């Protein structure tokens, strides 16, 4: 049986190699030229750009450096060895792929099962093309008519013959529990096969086409290579994505024992529902559960079965990735994450009863384990500047609470979530690493903690940890040794990794270092958990989705209305001098002035490095959306007069604007200025982008006379006179000393969006007696002394502007209900005094009305909110894990 399977696999994989030899002839191009193995920006790639963590960082690829998602094998011979060569030429060993005659994988005629006499099932051809097989009182199956998989009968019931041997194997028997089915499948597989399915590809598709998958497609290449997981970058396409997912599952069903593909997704704000900090501002775990349940339904409807989140890092004030978290408070993060994950992972009947795992369940990889919110200077840990998370307050335990007391001990029937490892190396206040100089995927201290606890969920690495990001500590190891070490330390799935040849070599190395029995124990544990999760998700029996239902659910008027309702709960009012109230505006359609704002385009990111950018003008809020509620006047953008860009086109300068006349502004009912919180990331002037880090390391990474720049939470330039003289963290230099990353005395320039403040200053000056309303889009705290004195009303929109809700609040139709999830510091000196690992330890800004902008502060029509949420979450931050004796573990292992 195994020999036959391996031969079939050998032939199928070799199809790709033989097609490559055809070049530009009439035969299709080789599918292995459509993708590559070195891909990988963040597994949370949706949540990590300098300005908008959910924006596409490759919208302007020429500005962001090389695209890590590009195919390095598009020009054979230039990109290194092909990672999709056949690793099974010598099962259990590494080595080169061998050639064999090509075969046609999808040559079989369309298959539709015909129930025999006494059959207890019915067969329906769906409009989507897959076959639905409904067993009486049993499982409903989904089957592709072109995958080669047929039906076998037993006791009158239908079962999918996933390994195509004409028999009913236990793993194909839906009457058995997931553990028993998993055990049978694992017993049928070779060691290197089990290792290969642990690949979680960064590149499951190139165009997410709605056309059937061909042998030229990336989807075919990756899945026929053996990967059985991968992230989608296109989940918002709704029905089109569902069609692609169905086609991908048909390919997966055709080979590799019919194992389905786990399609994962980053946070995506699907249907406009609030997530991360915008969900946190509601401080409502019940709403988090509702959103988790609805999000899971929508994800499953597009074919997604795993969520790369939620991000439960306890964020420091300057953390670059703060916008993807639930804020800075451990109790709030614990409550929201537990409710959200519990609801996402469970399936519910019509009465709301928790059924545990089922057809509506989405598996969660809670991230980033653990402590990633405490990076020094807030630096992004994808890049070597953010290599370390620091714990000067000896408070790592507070960053573990959400895991051990929450998502590892869910109140529902699914028990526990999975986890994603962090990139950073955790160090104490003296700069001494927890578990040695190892990033999260390799770290024995963090992985050992999970083992000591008895964690039985899936562990996936963050993206790129075997190649460029989070490879910290393993730089001198070849890739197969990195992968083998990761498995030895306890990780299961390899996030963003595609290279089957490296996997074959890593498995051989695992056997060499540990012996066959121990190597199989390591791989079997990882593969078994992965298979069992997909069994629990009902993926083996029914991996297909009804795209008509997708269209009804995703992007529908009903789902959009629900998304808007969640947004209404999230907006925070922190100042109101009486300008707005429940009584509404005096006019039916008030007249408002909305200015344009200038942005220099400067950015520093782990993807694009130091990018001077180019200037741009844009309306400070969505004028089309606001025009439904207001008579809007605005500015006029003139032709650009700045220096030409690389294409010879003039660029915009701060002077290329004609502001609305002051007399027109004075005739308005309101001035409404949309702003984005100021944020300047901490970086050094020899900044190394993530995917050239290894090359830089190999060539001698360390530079003399490096200047480090401070993070800043204000619009104006900031000189860090009170910063640490010596940084806590730093790489060990060739002479054995530690690099000093201090930025004391260095000045951060004006924020790239300093134009927001200039627009407010002009509007305030021109307004006269016209009330000025600021709508601030935020992802963290900020210094308000530049803004607050100029505004009569301030509304905070976490993650992004919500123009409909802002308009409703101004018109008195919606009462603000949100609360601040970050302290707003009095000044930057408070930020410098703050200990990165200690929540809520700053003196906060007090405004002209006497209100202090502290955590859990917010106003409604009656004034300062003081409800049960405020009473619950205003208590002193918790710092002790209840479900795990961390102090004992630390004493024994640090």
Please provide the spans of the model-predicted regions.
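Bacterial N-terminal signal peptides that target proteins for export
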Residues: 1-10
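C-terminal motif of bacterial Sec signal peptides marking the signal peptidase cleavage site
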Residues: 17-21
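Bacterial signal peptide processing site
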Residues: 23-25
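Glycoside hydrolase catalytic-domain context in secreted enzymes
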Residues: 29, 33, 39-43, 55-894
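G/A/S/T/P/Q/N-biased, glycine-rich low-complexity segments that form flexible N-terminal tails, linkers
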Residues: 45-50
């Amino acid at each position: 049986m195994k020999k036959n399977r391996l031969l079939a696999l050998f032939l199928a994989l070799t199809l790709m190699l033989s097609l490559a030899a055809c070049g530009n002839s009439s035969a299709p191009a080789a599918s292995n030229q459509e993708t590559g193995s070195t891909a990988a920006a963040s597994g949370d790639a949706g949540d990590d750009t300098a300005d908008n963590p959910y924006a596409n960082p490759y919208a302007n690829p020429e500005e962001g450096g090389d695209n890590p998602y590009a195919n390095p094998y598009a020009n054979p011979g230039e990109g290194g060895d092909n990672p999709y060569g056949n690793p099974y030429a010598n099962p259990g060993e590494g080595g080169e792929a061998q050639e064999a005659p090509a075969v046609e994988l999808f040559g079989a005629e369309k298959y539709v099962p015909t129930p025999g006499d006494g059959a207890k099932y019915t067969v329906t051809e769906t409009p989507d093309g897959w076959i639905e097989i409904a067993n009486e009182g049993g499982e409903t199956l989904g089957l592709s008519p072109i995958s080669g998989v047929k039906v076998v009968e037993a006791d009158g019931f239908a079962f999918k013959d996933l390994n195509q041997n004409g028999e009913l194997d236990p793993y194909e028997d839906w009457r058995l529990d997931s553990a028993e089915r998993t055990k049978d499948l694992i017993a049928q597989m070779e060691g290197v096969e089990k290792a290969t399915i642990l690949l979680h590809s960064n590149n499951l598709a190139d165009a997410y086409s709605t056309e059937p998958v061909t042998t030229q497609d990336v989807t075919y290449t990756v899945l026929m290579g053996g990967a059985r997981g991968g992230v989608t970058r296109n989940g918002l396409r709704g029905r089109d994505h569902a069609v692609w997912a169905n086609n991908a599952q048909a390919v997966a069903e055709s080979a590799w024992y019919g194992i389905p593909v786990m399609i994962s997704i980053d946070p995506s704000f699907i249907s406009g529902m609030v997530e991360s900090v915008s969900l946190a501002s509601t401080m409502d775990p019940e709403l988090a559960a509702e959103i988790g349940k609805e999000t899971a339904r929508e994800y499953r409807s597009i074919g997604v079965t795993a969520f790369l989140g939620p991000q439960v890092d306890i964020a420091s004030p300057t953390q670059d990735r703060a916008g993807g978290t639930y804020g800075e408070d451990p109790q709030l993060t614990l409550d929201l994450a537990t409710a959200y994950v519990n609801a996402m992972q469970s399936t519910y009947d019509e009465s709301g009863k928790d059924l545990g795992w089922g057809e509506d369940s989405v598996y969660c990889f809670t991230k980033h384990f653990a402590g990633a919110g405490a990076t020094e200077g807030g630096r992004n840990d994808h890049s070597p500047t953010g290599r370390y998370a620091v714990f000067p307050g000896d408070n790592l335990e507070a960053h573990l609470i959400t895991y051990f007391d929450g998502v590892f001990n869910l109140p529902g029937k699914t028990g526990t979530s999975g986890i994603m490892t962090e990139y950073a190396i955790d160090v104490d206040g003296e700069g001494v690493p927890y578990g040695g100089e190892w990033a999260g995927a390799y770290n024995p201290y963090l992985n050992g903690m999970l083992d000591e606890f008895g964690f039985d969920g899936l562990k996936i690495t963050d993206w790129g940890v075997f190649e460029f990001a989070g490879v910290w500590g393993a730089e001198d190891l070849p890739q197969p040794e990195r992968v083998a070490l990761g498995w030895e330390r306890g990780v299961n799935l390899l996030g963003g990794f595609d290279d089957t040849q490296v996997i074959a070599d890593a498995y051989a190395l695992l056997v060499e270092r540990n012996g066959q029995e121990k190597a199989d124990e390591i791989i079997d544990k990882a593969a078994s958990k992965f298979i069992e999760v997909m069994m629990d998700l009902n993926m083996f029996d029914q991996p297909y989705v009804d795209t008509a239902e997708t269209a009804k659910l995703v992007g529908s008027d009903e789902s959009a209305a629900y998304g808007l309702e969640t947004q209404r709960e999230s907006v925070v009012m922190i100042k109101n001098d009486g300008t707005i109230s429940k009584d509404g505006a005096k006019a039916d359609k008030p007249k408002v002035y909305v200015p344009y704002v200038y942005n220099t385009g400067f950015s520093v990111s782990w993807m694009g490095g130091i990018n001077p950018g180019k200037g741009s003008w844009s309306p400070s809020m969505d004028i089309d959306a606001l025009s439904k509620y207001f008579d809007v006047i605005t500015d006029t953008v003139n032709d650009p007069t700045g220096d030409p860009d690389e294409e010879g086109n003039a660029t915009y300068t701060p002077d290329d604007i004609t502001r609305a006349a002051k007399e027109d502004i004075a005739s308005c009912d309101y001035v409404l200025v949309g702003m984005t919180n100021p944020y300047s990331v901490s970086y050094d002037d020899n900044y190394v982008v993530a995917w050239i880090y290894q090359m830089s390391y190999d060539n001698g990474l360390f530079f003399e006379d490096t200047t480090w720049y401070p993070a800043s939470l204000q619009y104006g330039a900031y000189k860090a006179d009170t910063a640490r003289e010596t940084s806590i963290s730093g790489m060990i230099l060739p002479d054995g000393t530690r690099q000093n990353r201090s930025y004391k005395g260095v000045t951060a320039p004006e924020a790239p969006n300093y134009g927001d403040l200039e627009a407010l200053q002009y509007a305030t000056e021109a307004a006269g007696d016209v009330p000025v309303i600021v709508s601030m889009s935020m992802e963290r705290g900020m210094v308000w002394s530049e803004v607050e004195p100029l505004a009569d009303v301030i509304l905070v929109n976490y993650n992004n502007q919500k123009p409909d809700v802002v308009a409703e609040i101004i018109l008195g139709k919606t009462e603000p209900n949100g609360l601040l999830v970050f302290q707003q510091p009095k000044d930057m000196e408070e930020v410098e005094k703050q200990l990165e690992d200690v929540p809520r330890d700053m003196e906060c800004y007090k405004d002209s009305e006497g209100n202090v902008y502290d955590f859990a502060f917010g106003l409604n029509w009656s004034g300062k909110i003081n409800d049960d949420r405020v009473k619950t979450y205003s208590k002193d931050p918790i710092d002790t894990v209840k479900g795990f004796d961390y102090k004992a573990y630390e004493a024994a292992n640090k």
